[in-house]
A protein has these predicted regions:
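RNA substrate-binding interface of SAM-dependent RNA methyltransferases
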Residues: 2-123
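Glycine-rich loops and low-complexity Gly/Arg-rich segments
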Residues: 29-32, 79-82, 146, 167-170, ...
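Short, exposed beta-strand "edge-strand" segments with a Pro/Gly-rich flavor and a Y/T-containing core
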Residues: 96-101, 148, 161, 171-173
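Short, low-complexity, polar/charged sequence segments that are solvent-exposed and flexible
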Residues: 23-27, 73-76, 137-140, 162, ...
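Short, amphipathic alpha-helical segments
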Residues: 30, 144-152, 172-176
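Structured adenosyl-cofactor binding patch, chiefly the S-adenosyl-L-methionine
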Residues: 153-193
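Active-site cofactor/cluster-binding pocket
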Residues: 100-143, 149-157
Length: 193
């Protein structure tokens, strides 16, 4: 299982955004729509989609956990936005679960090295090629910031739990690009073995 954790501290947990204005009314909910498309639609080539999970932490109060939608896969950004909106309005499809929770609770759940490692995706971390050997001896989760990166509360948690930082290079990429790159990194290393 490969897991992505997208932090969205500014998004409202009420699901009250307008479909025609996702970045503005949704306070950058478009980031999550693109992550989901990268994770379950165009990102994986050989990696089993059933072995992917994407968690969105909304406003540090609400957790949406997305698994492979199968035949119900949304076809575009608005389709994903509808799924997110319905889930936040207590009408999730079977492949989305909704719960209460915070960034710290999710960190405690998935950062249990050496069995389970929570990596922070950060331009300034160790390059992914340097940690490649470690990736195969642990269950991996990758945490992503929003368009502004990580806020000060999250930075404090990253320091408190000593979360390792991993980089895809010095350039700042869209989080959807990071999701797809991590999946291809795993696909590539599986093919090498
Ligand atoms: C659009 S970027 C945020 C850019 C923001 N200017 C910043 O300073 O963090 C969204 C998230 O994608 C991830 N990210 C972007 N580029 C990356 C890279 N080169 N390596 C690792 N993670 C990256 C980080 O988690 C980042 O918080």
């Amino acid at each position: 299982m490969l897991r992505f954790i997208q932090l969205l501290p500014q998004v409202s947990p009420k699901g009250d955004f307008i479909l025609k204005d996702l970045p503005g009314s949704g306070k950058r909910i478009d980031i999550l729509c693109r992550d989901l498309a990268a994770c379950f639609s165009w990102g994986p080539i050989t990696w089993l989609k059933a072995s992917l999970e994407l968690i969105a932490i909304i406003a540090d109060t609400t957790i949406l956990t997305f698994r492979h939608p199968g035949d119900e896969i949304p076809q575009n950004e608005v389709g994903w936005a509808l799924v997110i909106r319905n889930s936040l309005r207590e009408q999730p499809p079977e492949w989305v679960s909704v719960s209460n929770g915070s960034v710290e609770e999710i960190i405690k759940m998935y950062s249990n090295p050496p069995e389970s490692t929570l990596w922070v995706l950060d331009e300034k971390g160790s390059h992914v090629s340097e940690i490649e050997t470690k990736l195969h001896i642990t269950q991996n989760s990758f945490m992503l910031g929003n368009h502004k990166g990580f806020n000060s509360q999250t930075e404090e948690l990253i320091a408190k739990y000593k979360l390792p930082r991993v980089s895809l290079g010095k350039k700042s990429y869209l989080s959807s690009h990071c999701v797809a790159s991590i999946i291809s990194e795993f696909e590539r290393s599986e093919n090498v073995e």
